Amino acid sequence: MIDRETSGRALQQIPYGLYIVGSLNGGVPATIVANWVTQVSFSPPWVAIAVEAGSRMKEYIAASGFFSVNILPSGGRDMAKAFLKGPEAEGGTIGGKKFEGAKNGTPFLAGASASFECRVVQALDAPDHRIFIGEVVDAVVRREGKDVLTLRETGWRYKK
């Protein structure tokens, strides 16, 4: 059996970005902060995200069939902090931040360096997360070539 403390420290060495993942709760945009996001295919372009098993977001994504990923720029800690409690849309903003609806309504945040919307093509359960794989169906780039916000930059930790 592997030592969980040692394996946890080893896994913390993976460079994790911080992203705002969005979906729709009965047509209302909702968001969470996520850091387990990766591209898994070039053609077609597919992305995988992991959502905590206890998060309502996994139900929103499953019901709507879509999710968005908003890539935050380096220095965007305060922006990420606004989404830690998983806010929903209110008067054209989420967590006080402006957004626009993507092709299928998921939120694209105005302050993100880039945003993309995915149609769910597969989902599977890991022991403590639900993994969604989605095909990119809409995208916008606002600031190309900028460094992205990382978990390490914020000083935050994500562990159980």
Q: For each predicted feature, which ranges?
A:
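Basic, polyanion-binding surface patches
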Residues: 1-160
